[in-house]
């Protein structure tokens, strides 16, 4: 198991508030992802999902926020918040964690398509940032339930869907597909 806490400390070195927010939020995401995984043991038994990797990647998925300008969550960088996924992927690749980097890169929203980047003129490199693997989708899904501004609170499904509608029906449809896969009875 990698020492995700040390990696987060390294990038939050002089920012105790951000470290606390990032660790708390990421732990919530990891715990939900692992709880969902516990309800689907066939994915672990088949080798399709590695629970150790899921915990590590969930803990590191938002490391890119350290480079963003989001004062409400003590992020004092210069980049737009929407960039945190690909920036986190760059950090994790530098740390020698390419598989973890893919999770960071593909967790924003329900994934960001090239069409969305062009339509919304997003300041991120033009490529498809949709989650591909079951592990990537699981962490992307679990992340939607927690905000970095309201630590300790679960977002209700209705609030998640309402927020995602701002990005179009395709975004909501992808979320609904993930819900059907991971928590079909909720």
Language model features with spans:
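Charged phosphate-binding loop/patch that engages nucleotide di/tri-phosphates or the phosphate backbone
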Residues: 164-186
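Charge-dense, low-complexity intrinsically disordered segments
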Residues: 16, 20-23, 132, 165, ...
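Generic structural signal for well-ordered, non-transmembrane alpha-helical segments
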Residues: 27, 31, 98, 180-183
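Exposed alpha-helical structural elements
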Residues: 3-10, 53, 99, 103, ...
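Acidic/His-rich, divalent-metal-binding segments that scaffold phosphate/diphosphate chemistry
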Residues: 1-81
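Divalent metal-dependent catalytic cores for phosphoryl transfer on phosphate-bearing substrates
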Residues: 49-153, 157
């Amino acid at each position: 198991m990698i020492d995700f806490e040390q990696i987060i400390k390294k990038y939050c070195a002089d920012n105790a508030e951000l470290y606390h927010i990032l660790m708390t939020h990421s732990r919530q995401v990891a715990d939900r992802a692992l709880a969902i995984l516990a309800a689907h043991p066939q994915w672990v038994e088949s080798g399709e999902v590695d629970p150790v990797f899921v915990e590590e990647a969930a803990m590191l998925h938002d490391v890119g926020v350290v480079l963003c300008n989001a004062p409400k969550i003590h992020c004092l960088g210069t980049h737009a918040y929407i960039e945190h996924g690909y920036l986190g992927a760059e950090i994790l690749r530098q740390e020698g964690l390419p598989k973890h980097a893919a999770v960071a890169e593909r967790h924003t929203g329900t994934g960001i398509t090239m069409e969305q980047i062009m339509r919304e003129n997003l300041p991120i490199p033009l490529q498809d940032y949709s989650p591909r693997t079951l592990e990537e989708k699981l962490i992307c899904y679990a992340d939607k339930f927690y905000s970095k501004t309201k630590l300790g609170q679960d977002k209700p499904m209705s609030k998640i869907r309402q927020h995602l509608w701002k990005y179009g029906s395709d975004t909501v449809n992808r979320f609904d597909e993930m819900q059907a896969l991971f928590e079909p009875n909720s």
